[in-house]
A protein has these predicted regions:
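A general structural signal for short secondary-structure junctions and capping/turn motifs
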Residues: 17-20, 46-48, 144-148
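Short, solvent-exposed secondary-structure capping/transition elements
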Residues: 36-38, 49-51, 66-68
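Extracellular structured ligand-interaction cores
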Residues: 23-26, 52-58
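Amphipathic alpha-helical interaction segments
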Residues: 29, 35-37, 47, 128, ...
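Extended catalytic/binding region for NAD+/ADP-ribose chemistry, centered on the ART fold
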Residues: 17-43
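Cytochrome P450 catalytic domain signature, combining two hallmark sequence patches
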Residues: 43-54
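Active-site and NAD+-binding cores of ADP-ribose-processing enzymes
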Residues: 2-3, 7, 11, 54-178
Length: 178
């Protein structure tokens, strides 16, 4: 897919999976081609892709919901309250985040909250977010008792494809060792 985009143009397709923790959009790792390649290699081992490939992108985040920002997190918290109220009123079950690892990779609740936030803004005719940016804490502790994990990264969900200015094949780097 990546080579086809570089050769023929076009865009990656937005993901609309129920576990898309930043809501639906085109997902990227921010500035971390090594982590992207490690993920692609793992997908190959699982038989989900044939050849690992990393596609870089030049992205203008534009109007971004930044989950490193206090106000951004407050909006997400409010969207969760709204989702809970709507679910109770409608008698529907709220999705849950599930998974055997600390990152709980099946992020159904987070996806529902983010999509609720975007729908609420749309209904109120507020400016739509073009992108969402947040920390993804993943993997094992890098040493006993560490707050750092082996696969931490910043993830982007681009909701507006016009934010993607172009694609490129990044130069890959390996983790430093000493």
């Amino acid at each position: 897919m990546g080579q086809k985009i570089l050769r023929d143009g076009g865009h990656l397709e937005p993901s609309v999976q129920q576990w898309d923790w930043l809501g639906h959009g085109i997902y990227f790792w921010e500035g971390n081609p090594g982590r992207a390649m490690a993920w692609a290699v793992q997908r190959q081992k699982e038989g989900k892709i044939e050849a690992p490939f990393v596609l870089g992108a030049i992205i203008d985040l534009r109007h971004c919901l930044d989950l490193f920002d206090h106000d951004g997190l407050a909006q997400v918290k409010q969207a969760h309250r709204l989702l809970m109220q709507v679910s109770v009123a409608a008698g529907t079950k709220v999705p849950r985040n599930v998974g055997a690892t600390a990152d709980r990779a099946g992020r159904g609740l987070d996806c529902a909250v983010m999509n609720t936030l975007h729908q609420y803004r749309k209904e109120r005719q507020e400016l739509a977010y073009d992108s969402v940016r947040g920390p993804f804490l993943e993997g094992e502790e890098i040493y006993p008792g560490a707050g750092f994990r082996s696969e931490n990264h910043i993830q982007l969900s681009v909701r507006n494809a016009e934010c993607v200015k172009g694609y490129f094949r990044p130069l890959h780097s390996k983790a430093a060792s000493f």
